[in-house]
From Swiss-Prot:
Its main location: membrane. Signal peptide: none annotated. It catalyses: ATP + H2O + 4 H(+)(in) = ADP + phosphate + 5 H(+)(out). GO terms for molecular function: ATP binding; ATP hydrolysis activity; proton-transporting ATP synthase activity, rotational mechanism. The gene is atpD. Its EC number is 7.1.2.2. NCBIfam families: atpD. This is ATP synthase subunit beta. It comes from Mesoplasma florum (strain ATCC 33453 / NBRC 100688 / NCTC 11704 / L1) (Acholeplasma florum). One of its GO terms (cellular component) is plasma membrane. It is a peripheral membrane protein. SUPFAM superfamilies: C-terminal domain of alpha and beta subunits of F1 ATP synthase (SSF47917), N-terminal domain of alpha and beta subunits of F1 ATP synthase (SSF50615), P-loop containing nucleoside triphosphate hydrolases (SSF52540). Pfam families: ATP-synt_ab, ATP-synt_ab_N, ATP-synt_VA_C. Keywords: ATP synthesis, ATP-binding, Cell membrane, CF(1), Hydrogen ion transport, Ion transport, Membrane, Nucleotide-binding, Translocase, Transport.
Amino acid sequence: MAAKKTTSKNTVNSANGFVFQILGPVVDVKFSEDNIPMIYDALVVDNNGVELVLEVEQHMGDEVVRTIAMGPTEGLAKGLPVINTNAPILAPVGDDVLGRMFNVTGHAIDEKPEFTGKRMPIHRDAPAYEELITNAEILETGIKVIDLMIPFAKGGKIGLFGGAGVGKTVLIQELINNIAKAHSGVSVFAGVGERTREGNDLYHEFIEAGVLDKTSLVFGQMNEPPGARMRVALTGLTIAEHFRDEKNMDVLLFIDNIFRFTQAGSEVSALLGRMPSAVGYQPTLSTEMGSLQERITSTNKGSITSVQAVYVPADDLTDPAPATTFTHLDAKIVLDRSIASLGIYPAVDPLSSSSRMLDPEIIGEEHYNVALGVQGTLQKYQDLQSIIAILGMDELSAEDKLIVQRARKIRNFLSQSFYVGEKFTGRPGQYVKVSDTVRSFKMILDGEMDDIPEILFLYKGTAEDVIQAYNETKVKNKK
């Protein structure tokens, strides 16, 4: 991580405290009685020419405060002068953050000039009740499988479950692209405990996909102290809040990985000497998660819709970290490697995925009935798989054969060409409106497309595209 060099004004003369004790990433600082900083205030110390930011976590008595370092403490020595900024850590905000990459303290790490614009504190209250919008509203993504089966709530939180190589990054890029184009929205990506290599790859992939200019990236990398990993999600959220509250925009906030936020909080809690709670997690787990998640919401000014990658330790859904996260999620998207192996992207498993917005009162009766019909057909097909594997298709009843044929068409039709993948696939990207998606799947369920081979449903946007491809095939065959 690129560290910021200290300026000449950060001298002993302007200091109002000094390093009293160093315990790894925990630094105790002693102040004069009339100048003790408040909890969450940011302190600055010159560590061999590099600015190290400390965040106040506890008052220890005798004018000593206990802080957590946001950077490496190697080389720090007792007696070094410390400056109280009299403010929390400040995140960069405004239009100038788009296309840029920052660390937890808001310093640029993309080898571009340092950010000099407006900044806001990362610690803020959640919006007041009177500012919230209570009516449920759908955020159209233009991605068929999501809009049909797992509709996003504006200001909602979506959990994204997927291993390596199943298309998680591409799905994130397409969501960023579609929100930017269809809703004139912006996106913020917070890499919490990310591998440095993954963050670097993501940055360059965003450049290649042409979505970087509508995105701001914030990283607290895996090799950084727990303080940086614990606070980087708040830095990203603060950037998103400014776009929502000051620019009245719909913002997409990606947090990868929300488990690392909890993990870093657990490390900090242990370093501060707090008694651990269940499974060794911090006793403040629910409070910390709630203070982050409650700020992600829709207000009368705009919305923040969050997509959060969720790591489940040892696949144990009862583990306190994922269990606490689940209580805040409105929807979950499960990416399945077996679907990806069929060449169907996005590799979303519609049977394992779910959304609380899949409600006839919110999305309408027709959409709800079509989604249930698709779900039921795919479930029946899954139930018949073992019979097909042993006895083959010929042993099925005529009704079951029809279900299998329609299910395979639905499965293929859930595939979609992405704008961000055009240069790799050679297929033009597709943004499909919800109304077109519902109408097209209804035609499959009603048997209007029973005569069309399942292969023609792959990577088509609407039913009209499938019919056109079918007619073109018939013309070719006649020749």
